[in-house]
Amino acid sequence: MNDSEFHRLADTLWLAIEERLDSWDGDSDIDCEINGGVLTLSFENGSKIIINRQEPLHQVWLATKQGGYHFDLKDDEWVCDRSGETFWDLLEQAATQQAGEKVSFR
């Protein structure tokens, strides 16, 4: 994958997160902000989830209260390079914990 393809795929991921949060009807408020390629989810309790792109590695990084995760694109799915879990699974787990209620991105 070249840099422009990586940015296109990351932009698609960012847009999917924004759209899913816009349509989410949970009790908690989750704010989504994009600044310079970094997507920040802010929760009512003051905690944050940071998602950013690592262009040189063509990876997406996810920082949560539970820890940091690095994702490579494999077969059209962002997959953690350590655990093999998908980006969506880990994001849902972290968002659910930080929001204090079930958060789904699917």
UniProtKB/Swiss-Prot annotation:
UniProt GO molecular function: ferric iron binding; ferrous iron binding
Matches recorded under SUPFAM superfamilies: Frataxin/Nqo15-like (SSF55387)
Single GO cellular component term: cytosol
Presence of the UniProt keyword Heme in the record: no
Single biological process term from Gene Ontology: iron-sulfur cluster assembly
Pfam (any one): Frataxin_Cyay
InterPro entries for the chain: CyaY (IPR047584), Frataxin/CyaY (IPR002908), Frataxin/CyaY_sf (IPR036524), Frataxin_CS (IPR020895)
Alphabetical UniProt keywords: Iron, Metal-binding
Gene3D superfamilies: Frataxin/CyaY
Function summary: Involved in iron-sulfur (Fe-S) cluster assembly. May act as a regulator of Fe-S biogenesis.
Stored PANTHER family: FRATAXIN (PTHR16821), FRATAXIN, MITOCHONDRIAL (PTHR16821:SF2)
Family: Belongs to the frataxin family.
HAMAP family, per database record: CyaY
Name of the protein in question: Iron-sulfur cluster assembly protein CyaY
Lineage, highest ranks first: Bacteria, Pseudomonadati, Pseudomonadota, Gammaproteobacteria, Enterobacterales
